[in-house]
Regions:
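A generic transmembrane-helix signature of 12-TM secondary carrier transporters
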Residues: 80, 84-87, 102-103, 172-176
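Residue-level signature of mid-helix packing/kink "hotspots" within the transmembrane helices
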Residues: 24, 53-61, 145-146
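Conserved MFS/SLC helix-loop-helix module at the cytosolic interface between two early adjacent transmembrane helices
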Residues: 58-97
Length: 177
């Protein structure tokens, strides 16, 4: 069964937007995470963002070739699974080191669907249609960093910082299906 173009655009935009949500959505929680996981040196908690970005960078290099070898769908599922598992570890982290390692893996996991979504657009469309679809996806990618901190702050109003990672887990696994 082939999905419609609007559904495809929405799915690809959500996969790409996960990266921005994973970084910007947790910004309101950073002081709380620092207070709990590294109270003696709260500035080290900023490494939580860096480790995700490093994971994304590493994952970006390998996920494209892996999707050529093993198939697009498998890499999307693998990346989404790693992302969800890592978000769960982040949620339960009791040390900064555990959090940093989990965020590194989460970045690698996020890279899979992000890279494959761009590849799928190029696989399925060309010319002006590809440019049009890519522009819709990039509009969403550009808007999400502005909205993600508000989402994170909204979660922090009602719950502890771990809830931000709990929100990341089911959201991502639903998108993979």
């Amino acid at each position: 069964m082939r999905i419609s173009t609007p559904e495809f655009i929405a799915l690809m935009a959500m996969l790409v937007a996960t990266v921005a949500l994973s970084i910007d959505g947790m910004l309101p929680a950073l002081p709380h995470i620092a207070a709990q996981l590294s109270p003696e040196s709260p500035n080290q908690a900023q490494l939580i963002l860096s480790s995700f970005v490093v994971g994304m960078a590493l994952g970006t290099f390998v996920m494209g070739p892996l999707s050529d070898s093993f198939g697009r769908k498998r890499i999307i599922y693998f990346g989404a699974g790693l992302y969800v598992l890592s978000a769960t570890v982040c949620m339960m982290a009791t040390s900064l080191e555990t959090m940093l390692f989990a965020r590194l893996l989460q970045g690698i996991g996020a890279a899979g669907p992000r890279v494959v979504s761009h590849v799928l657009v190029r696989d399925l469309y060309s010319g002006r249609e590809m440019a049009r679809i890519s522009s819709f996806i990039m509009i969403v990618f550009a808007l999400v960093p502005a909205m993600a901190p508000m989402l994170g702050a909204g979660v922090m109003i009602f719950f502890e910082w771990q809830a931000i990672f709990a929100v990341m887990s089911p959201r991502r696994s639903l998108r993979a299906n």
